[in-house]
Amino acid sequence: MNTTHGALSALILAGTRPGAPDPMAQACGVSHKAILPVGGTPMVLRVIRALQATPGIGRIAVCIDNPAVLDGLLPSDIEIVPSSPNGPSASVLAGLTQMGTPLLVTTADNALLRPEWISEFLAKCSPQTDVAAAVAPEAVVLRDVPGTRRTFIRLADMAFSGCNLFLFRTPASLQVAALWQRVEKNRKHPLRIAWLLGPGILLRAVCKKLTRAALCKRIGALSGTTAELVPLSDGRAAVDVDKPADLELTEKLIAADAAAKT
């Protein structure tokens, strides 16, 4: 995807999920995981700086339920989008409504995010796609972050971990966010999700015959869009801060990177 300077907006999801408080926030004594310090810097600020350093990105907004927790942290030009109590998918829909497309979406716990990863993702996105998600192939993750424990989705032709980086390129991509919302509502009911995706997809997944192309095609068919998974070349892009071990790993990687630059 080619972007002229300032043509692409970016949204950072930083709200709390409905229900129980985030365990990482509780463990670290903060109200929101987004403000948890990583290497001495609040996570959300690390993400903002990565976006600001990426060519082609203009407007940047943080989507959060209580903006007061960010007082004194954000640069003056960062916008606020109120998050939805109905979960991340509804918050993305709110962001799309306020900011329009194309919209790059990431999360505040994506503390390792780098401008070069964002640029690689955007460059690899097909100009025909409505929505794209960045992924890190398993082999790349294990090469770059040996010993890490990540969740991998296994397809017939690819095993990958998500990178919390999405591009909603066209207005049609709102339909994918709406589909995501339907899946999210049924996240505690696997059979309902399986029914939503269709028995053919489920059968191929169980038999380990579901390919990347077939999965994207099905998502596209359900939402009336074109969708794609975009592999990144750095396995560290799959690391986010979901648990204490992730925080330790993230700070270790940041320290190693800083040492390599001296």
Model-predicted segments: where are they?
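Short catalytic helix/loop segments, enriched in acidic residues and glycine
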Residues: A27-L45
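Conserved core of the sugar-phosphate nucleotidyltransferase
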Residues: R114-A221, L232-R236
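Short, conserved phosphate/pyrophosphate- and ester-handling motifs at nucleotide-, phospho-/glycolipid
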Residues: K243
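Short, acidic, metal-binding catalytic loop of nucleotide-sugar glycosyltransferases
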Residues: A50-I57
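Short, polar loop motifs at secondary-structure junctions
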Residues: I64-V69
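Short phosphate-binding loop-to-helix
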Residues: G72-V105, L112-L113, E120
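Residues at the starts of beta-strands that form the adenosine-phosphate
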Residues: S9, G58-I60, P102, D130
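N-terminal nucleotide-binding beta1-loop-alpha1 segment
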Residues: M1-G29
